[in-house]
UniProtKB/Swiss-Prot annotation:
Protein name: Histone H2B
Annotated Gene Ontology cellular component terms: nucleosome; nucleus
Organism: Neurospora crassa (strain ATCC 24698 / 74-OR23-1A / CBS 708.71 / DSM 1257 / FGSC 987)
Keyword Acetylation: yes
Species classification: Eukaryota, Fungi, Dikarya, Ascomycota, Pezizomycotina
Protein localization: Nucleus; Chromosome
PTM remark: Monoubiquitinated by the ubc-2-bre-1 complex to form H2BK123ub1. H2BK123ub1 gives a specific tag for epigenetic transcriptional activation and is also prerequisite for H3K4me and H3K79me formation. H2BK123ub1 also modulates the formation of double-strand breaks during meiosis and is a prerequisite for DNA-damage checkpoint activation.
Cross-link Glycyl lysine isopeptide (Lys-Gly) (interchain with G-Cter in ubiquitin) placement: K131
Role, per record: Core component of nucleosome. Nucleosomes wrap and compact DNA into chromatin, limiting DNA accessibility to the cellular machineries which require DNA as a template. Histones thereby play a central role in transcription regulation, DNA repair, DNA replication and chromosomal stability. DNA accessibility is regulated via a complex set of post-translational modifications of histones, also called histone code, and nucleosome remodeling.
Region span, Disordered: 1-45
SUPFAM superfamilies registered for this protein in UniProt: Histone-fold
UniProt keyword annotations, A-Z: Acetylation, Chromosome, DNA-binding, Isopeptide bond, Nucleosome core, Nucleus, Phosphoprotein, Ubl conjugation
Biased composition (Basic and acidic residues): 1-10
Modified residues (Phosphoserine): S12
Length: 137
């Protein structure tokens, strides 16, 4: 039997907000239970696999590569990238600059890679930057 109007207690603010919260939860349940399930998109994993494969085909057109070898090379590229970026960041901080330029990248490559490998990397990097600069103009 419903209570008489005289028996009702004056409403306080706490129960009013408490009664609103379940309504919001119910609204959330209704949308979930309605069957409008969105198909989850698979998280894209960024790798260097396609680039590694292209370089492999330039150097050895008739040679393939296993998934395990590709994974190892991808880890290697990520590791070198992280080392160069960290070193370039330190160099920029030492020189009180907020921007990493090609000069910091070049210096960090010289510091990280040994001897002849550093020379080849710097020359290839310079060639790539020159090619990019000429194509954007």
């Amino acid at each position: 039997m419903p209570p008489k109007p005289a028996d009702k207690k004056p409403a306080s603010k706490a129960p009013a907000t408490a009664s609103k919260a379940p309504e919001k939860k119910d609204a959330g349940k209704k949308t979930a239970a309605s069957g409008d399930k969105k198909k989850r998109t698979k998280a894209r994993k960024e790798t260097y696999s396609s680039y590694i494969y292209k370089v492999l085909k330039q150097v050895h057109p008739d040679t393939g590569i296993s998934n395990r070898a590709m994974s190892i090379l991808n880890s290697f590229v990520n590791d070198i990238f992280e080392r160069v970026a960290t070193e370039a960041s330190k160099l920029a901080a030492y020189n009180k600059k907020s921007t990493i330029s090609s000069r910091e990248i070049q210096t960090s490559v010289r510091l990280i890679l040994p001897g002849e490998l550093a020379k080849h990397a710097v020359s290839e990097g310079t060639k790539a930057v020159t090619k990019y600069s000429s194509s954007t103009k």
